């Protein structure tokens, strides 16, 4: 199946087009900048970014109040109305600052290009949430039937970077929402990739509730994998010849976790405990010695 053309030119050509507007100072020309009523500008319906930091918007709104909007938004005119194609955050902050008007550059752009311009602007943002970036990558890959290798060249990132970001989309919806809401970092999220959904969400609760670091999360995920491989001979964790029944070990493990945030792993005739909070380990040791 032939690949879709990106508006007859190719996706790679769109990137320098956006940069041309902002980097070559074209917006300084009087015939390119207009002052539009804030309510005349309609949001881009194809904007892939759904969540914006309230604190960040407040800071930008205050800056706009004091210094004005330094970089105009990009809009396209259609039937007497203006549709935003780049600058969603600036538009929201200007509304928050109760500005009656907003500086804009009216560009001659086909309507179907609005989505890809929004996607590209999104990808180029430094503060973009990793999951939003993954979704933007996915939309570009699917819309234009390109490979990850081709996309990596366009966005000037390694293929490994694109692949790793895309793997975040395999996480459970609960984990994805936590990442979007910045309850966990991308480092935490990457540790959970590949785990069963139930284990992902169990570890997620621990990350949030216990404020685990990425390293602690890696240790916890490793323990879950070890416990799942108890019957694997090559790891030496076969339980059939131990004196502890599997259900007894499971109850013991659950009790340890509930009370002391400890995990127990059975290695031959030894039980190895892993601790995730020093204060609780001290409480456990005092209990054992009392």
UniProtKB/Swiss-Prot annotation:
InterPro entries in the cross-refs: Chromosome_partition/occlusion, HTH_ParB/Spo0J, ParB/RepB/Spo0J, ParB/Sulfiredoxin_dom, ParB/Sulfiredoxin_sf
Pfam family of the protein (one): HTH_ParB
Top-level lineage group: Bacteria
Keywords: Chromosome partition, DNA-binding
GO biological process, one term: positive regulation of sporulation resulting in formation of a cellular spore
One GO molecular-function entry: DNA binding
Keyword DNA-binding: yes
Family: Belongs to the ParB family.
Function in brief: Involved in chromosome partition. Localize to both poles of the predivisional cell following completion of DNA replication. Binds to the DNA origin of replication.
Name of the protein: Probable chromosome-partitioning protein ParB
Organism: Helicobacter pylori (strain J99 / ATCC 700824) (Campylobacter pylori J99)
